């Protein structure tokens, strides 16, 4: 069974290590108990949205980036291809077809 809390914990730990921060530093910046954050990173505790937001701010990473990474990891575990970003422009070939009509 896929546990989202494990994937979330892995993402948070990976980001923290990439940023070169200790668990203690992030817990302090986020005003979260060190032991609790450790349990979240190990996938043993579910984090509330408020805790996630505080940790994201402490890591200086948008919460949306964290959640997107978790979603991609869960999709991979489920055997789905990673989600592709939706383009914010209309491809030229569609514009030329539209203009011709």
Roles of regions detected by a PLM:
Residues 1-18:
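A short, Lys/Arg-rich alpha-helix, primarily the initiator
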Residues 13, 24, 53:
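Residues within the helices of the helix-turn-helix
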Residues 48-56, 66:
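Hydrophobic micro-packing sites on short alpha-helices
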Residues 68-101:
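Short, charged recognition helix plus adjacent turn
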Residues 16, 27, 56:
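The alpha-helix within a helix-turn-helix
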Residues 10, 20-21, 47-50:
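Residue-level signal for the short linker/turn that defines the boundary of a DNA-recognition helix
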Residues 22-38:
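Short alpha-helical DNA-recognition segment
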């Amino acid at each position: 069974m896929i546990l989202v809390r494990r994937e979330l914990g892995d993402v948070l730990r990976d980001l923290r290590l990439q940023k070169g921060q200790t668990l203690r530093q992030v817990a302090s910046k986020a005003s979260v108990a060190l032991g609790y954050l450790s349990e979240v990173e190990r996938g043993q505790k579910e984090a509330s949205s408020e805790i996630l937001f505080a940790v994201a701010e402490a890591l200086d990473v948008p919460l949306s980036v964290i959640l997107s990474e978790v979603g991609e990891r869960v999709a991979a575990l489920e055997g789905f291809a990673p989600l592709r970003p939706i383009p914010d422009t209309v491809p030229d070939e569609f514009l030329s077809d539209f203009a011709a009509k």
